[in-house]
Amino acid sequence: MFNRIRVVTMLMMVLGVFALLQLVSGGLLFSSLQHNQQGFVISNELRQQQSELTSTWDLMLQTRINLSRSAARMMMDASNQQSSAKTDLLQNAKTTLAQAAAHYANFKNMTPLPAMAEASANVDEKYQRYQAALAELIQFLDNGNMDAYFAQPTQGMQNALGEALGNYARVSENLYRQTFDQSAHDYRFAQWQLGVLAVVLVLILMVVWFGIRHALLNPLARVITHIREIASGDLTKTLTVSGRNEIGELAGTVEHMQRSLIDTVTQVREGSDAIYSGTSEIAAGNTDLSSRTEQQASALEETAASMEQLTATVKQNADNARQASQLAQSASETARHGGKVVDGVVNTMHEIADSSKKIADIISVIDGIAFQTNILALNAAVEAARAGEQGRGFAVVAGEVRNLASRSAQAAKEIKALIEDSVSRVDTGSVLVESAGETMTDIVNAVTRVTDIMGEIASASDEQSRGIDQVALAVSEMDRVTQQNASLVQESAAAAAALEEQASRLTQAVSAFRLASRPLAVNKPEMRLSVNAQSGNTPQSLAARDDANWETF
């Protein structure tokens, strides 16, 4: 359960619980202090009220004593020889009575407690009677009325006031004792509350300690131990920490780091093995490369000789192509001229055909006129026959006109037939001339294409000539590079030896890590096969690069 709670949430809950306990304890302490304050206020008020009543009672007793002494002296000194002493006693009685009234006024100004209301009212009633009696006694003594003085029942009033004050004192004592008992009870209750809070606090601390230890300390200790094992090179153990809090996330991150480190170490081991085997293959390849470099040098010499012969042949082909291009251009000009002549003939034939068509149209008009004339002559003959002898001459003329119209129509038909035959022949000639023009156009186009092809052949021959010159330069450059390759082979052998030593050191460094049993033996041959496959494909890639270089040349 604790593993599912985040550390921040747990700390906030603990702080919330402690804050709640602090509020509860503070509230209880405030309540206890409030009760104590109320008890203290009650005790203080009782003390002040009791003090004022006591002072009032004492002063009233002194007033009674002074009055009694003054009355006694007045009775013993009938001649009034000690009038000053009597006056002083009487004045003291007035003063003490006034002081008693002042103290009682202070008592009355204090608000009585509810429990003391009845006793306070009783005291007030008895006080008012006794105070009035004392004032009346003072007045009797001032007037010298001794009979009235002794006849007044002052002692009964004094006793009644004393009993009322005693009752008030007993009620006050009971209230004070109740207040004290309540304070003692509050104190014991506060002690019990503090004890309960202490027990609850201890229980909460135990729960918090158990939760922190279970959710934070123990998983953190396992994570630290696991990290130390990883630091010592042991990658075989796994970290088992469950939960969705920060410690669980930390454990998951450490576990992911361990897996990544295992993959890295495995790849480094495989890479070091591949590098070690690759350095051996590089050393063997350097030996083969040295012999192949010598063979390449001799082949380059033969290639240089062949390139010289090829250069001479290509230059001769370029010259022949230039001459053929010039002849083709001349034939193209002649064909263009013939095409223009044929175009002129075609245009002339079209004009003749148009003229023949116009003549045929005119003959058609003449034929129509002859036909209309024949009809008119026929109508004239009919009218002449109707006229009789008067129209005989007109009939002869009409007959001649008909004969002329018939011969004109016949001649027009023959001319029309000849013209139509001429038009058909002109059309046939036009078709033949157009065919000849198209043929001349095809000849011109063919000669033009031949001219273009010969020009391209000539330019290609020039390009080949320049390319062969560049190839010759490249062959000489390749010869120089081949000489450099011989020295590079020696440097490569030294580098392969150094690489083999570094691979051995890398293998020793990686061997410090201990890995769990994994099917690595199966992966290594696959790695070797992939390396061999890549090495087998290398000549093809080199050949492809060589072809690209040849195309560049």
Curated annotation (Swiss-Prot):
Residues 64-73 are annotated as: The 3 Arg may form a positively charged pocket, which binds the alpha-carboxyl group of the attractant AA. This is Methyl-accepting chemotaxis protein II. The chain crosses the membrane at residues 7-33, 191-211. The gene is tar. Residues 34-190 are periplasmic. It is a multi-pass membrane protein. The keyword Metal-binding does not apply. Residues 1-6, 212-553 are cytoplasmic. Belongs to the methyl-accepting chemotaxis (MCP) protein family. The modification Glutamate methyl ester (Gln) is found at Q295, Q309. Residues 532-553 are annotated as: Disordered. Receptor for the attractant L-aspartate and related amino and dicarboxylic acids. Tar mediates taxis away from the repellents cobalt and nickel. Unlike in E.coli tar, it does not mediate maltose taxis.
